């Protein structure tokens, strides 16, 4: 089994990588993993999580290994990784919710459940339904009209404090 963490420093209101990298290392050590058992990547641009996930899934498949990926970011980072591993039966994707919307988390559980690294590393896989659209893969919601316009504009405003 191979493990990969994809961290998006641009997701949410603040960069999650500073606090999360040491937490991941500590949780991995508690799980009995060596540093060679897992990889942590920080995404650098839109689409990077998809590229990293696809490359890792291909490499694991060629080696006959399974791959478990966790994304730390928002729904966009999660969906990039889901799209990247699409078609690879050896790969599973988990979500650490550090984005601004986190629709996936609200659909399937609570923030406490999803941010518990020990539980995430020890947990099993759960199959969910996804929907393929002309614009990509969806695991929670597809919207048109006002909802879509609001979602499209969020990157411009996500780090502006509301109060």
Map each language-model feature to its residues:
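Helix N-cap/beta->alpha junction signal
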Residues: 45, 73-74, 143
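Catalytic core of DAGKc-family lipid kinases
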Residues: 86-163
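Short Gly/Thr/Asp-enriched flexible loops that form oxyanion-binding sites at enzyme active sites
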Residues: 77-89
């Amino acid at each position: 089994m191979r493990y990969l963490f994809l961290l998006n420093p641009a997701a949410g209101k603040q960069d999650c990588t500073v606090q999360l990298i040491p937490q991941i290392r500590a949780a991995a050590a508690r799980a009995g993993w060596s540093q060679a058992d897992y990889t942590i990547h920080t995404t650098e641009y839109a689409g990077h999580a998809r590229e990293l996930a696809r490359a890792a899934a291909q490499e694991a498949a060629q080696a006959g290994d399974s791959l478990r990926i966790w994304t730390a970011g928002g729904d966009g980072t999660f969906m990039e990784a889901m799209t990247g591993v699409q078609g690879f039966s050896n790969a599973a994707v988990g979500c650490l919710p550090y984005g601004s919307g986190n629709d996936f988390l609200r659909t399937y559980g609570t923030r406490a459940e999803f941010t518990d690294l020990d539980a995430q590393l020890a947990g099993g896989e759960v199959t969910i339904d996804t929907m393929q659209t002309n614009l990509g893969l969806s695991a929670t919601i597809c919207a048109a009209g006002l909802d879509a316009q609001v979602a499209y504009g969020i990157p411009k405003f996500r780090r502006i404090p509301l109060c």
